[in-house]
Amino acid sequence: MENFLIARRLVEAGARVVSLNFSRWDWHGDNFKIARNDMPMLDRAVSALVEDLSNRGLLNDVSIVVWGEFGRTPKINNTAGRDHWPQVSCALLAGGGMRTGQVIGATNRLGEYA
């Protein structure tokens, strides 16, 4: 989670773009165990970054994008994981003056196709 603090410090120092990596998201197996470990940490780290930037008056000037390069299968595979699924993906957007509390886009009922 230290890399989130470093990202904030880089923004304060005037960096125009900061990219960071958190965990390893290629969960082809043991999806539930890994998610129970990693997702709370990601939630705390992103929440702290948003709050930190807001408290410093920087949030409207910084766009935060939490995103992977493709989605995961809507169905669990035989090793309790999810495989690559380029048909649907998701991203979390914050800051940058964006309106909050919205969902953009939709999938079918099973999350298979947009």
Residue ranges, per PLM feature:
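Ligand-binding pockets and gating/stacking loops
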Residues: 1-114
